[in-house]
């Protein structure tokens, strides 16, 4: 099965100068886990996900896991979330983006998602995003084909 058979062609994207607040609202409202970041020529320059949205709220999360007892006032830290609302996506987006083509096998897309710990991949053809393929759509297609679910 090819990526083109599963990809969603209704691609919601953002630009590098989209604000944190706007991208968070967009992902939440449309109930998607991420979106490609496109430049003015509609080329993929990054990807922003729910994980990136949460991670910027907790820039200290790695040190927290090393020494959780040193973080006593979590509410005060969370109250500073408003300070980042105008931060541009280009500051916290992922830059080294893995993409697939419409002709790639879905098993390749699935393997790339697992290897890179992502749940969605932009589908690119001739340098332009033509769709998004999700781990969920691959999972469902494989179960349906192999187990009749």
Q: What are the residue ranges of the model-derived segments?
A:
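Bateman/CBS regulatory modules and CBS-like beta-alpha motifs in cytosolic regions of diverse proteins
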Residues: 1-32, 37-40, 44-45, 68-112, ...
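Ca2+-coordinating acidic residues in Ca2+-binding motifs
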Residues: 5, 52, 137
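Short hydrophobic beta-strand motif reused across regulatory alpha/beta modules
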Residues: 46-49, 132-138
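A short, polar/charged loop-to-alpha-helix boundary motif
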Residues: 54-69, 138-149
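Extended hydrophobic
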Residues: 114-115, 121, 138
């Amino acid at each position: 099965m090819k990526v083109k058979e599963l990809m969603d062609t209704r691609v919601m994207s953002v630009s590098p100068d989209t604000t944190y607040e706007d991208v968070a609202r967009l992902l939440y409202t449309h109930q998607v886990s991420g979106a490609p970041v496109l430049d003015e020529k509609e080329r993929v320059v990054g990807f922003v996900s729910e994980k990136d949205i949460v991670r910027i709220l907790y820039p200290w999360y790695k040190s927290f896991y090393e020494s959780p007892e040193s973080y006593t006032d979590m509410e005060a830290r969370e109250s500073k979330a408003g300070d980042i609302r105008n931060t541009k996506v280009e500051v916290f987006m992922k830059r080294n983006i893995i993409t697939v083509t419409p002709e790639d096998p879905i098993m390749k897309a699935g393997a790339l998602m697992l290897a890179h710990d992502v749940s969605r991949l932009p589908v690119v053809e001739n340098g332009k995003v033509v769709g998004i393929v999700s781990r969920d759509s691959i999972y469902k297609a494989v179960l349906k084909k192999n187990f009749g679910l």
